[in-house]
Amino acid sequence: LKNLGVKNRSRLFQIPPHIEYLTVKPHMKRYMQVSAEIYGTLLKYVAPEDVHVYSIDEYFIDITPYLPLYKKTPRQLAQMLLDAVLAATKIYATVGIGTNLFLAKIALDILAKHAPDFIGYLDESLFKEKIWYHQPLTDIWQIGKGIANRLHKYGAYDLHGITMIPEAKLYKEFGINAELIIDHAWGREPCTIADIHAYRPIKHSISHSQILLRNYTYEEVYVPMRELVESLVLELLQIKGVTNHI
């Protein structure tokens, strides 16, 4: 769509007139149901402690212990999971394989979605070959426009360019966040799924939201509001949390 002149999050009147399109109302409830079906399918092959639910449609899976179990290579195991999801939901999924969480995410975002088999693979050497000079920087996970513009001031327009900036300057510009930027510029990511599961924040809050397609009356908004509260209560139970404020 970008090649046709449609920017991300464009409004309808901003779409070029020569492009034909359909407007379809979102069905978030159905989206969540399919997401749950996909997650349930994955759990037939891997244990929940080896899965990190990153978003409603993305999961990180540590497949290391399953390679000898299923006697498959990483790509073969990925294909097995893709086939299982397709058979269960009729959804064509994509997979990014990497030797750490960052490389797996980048393999998904930049390589897998353009691969004929919907699978992307990166290790440290392939990262330097295929990703180091990739532009724009905003395609890279966790680099938004603000961070990219600040890096441009130092002449960095790709990850390789970041490695050319003295680390002292990066720490002065970004503070402690420079450590993450530097690690990712070299294709490193020390955090593991086990680390994520073991993390316990000192303060924790949870929230849900729902986009309404029109203005609701008080009576109408009661039902979705109640559903949101009930979902939050269930999430509190899962994390064994308590609250005195909603």
Regions found by a protein language model. Give the residues of each.
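Gly/Gly-Pro- and Ser/Thr-rich, intrinsically disordered tail segments characteristic of DNA damage-repair
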Residues: 1-183, 193-195
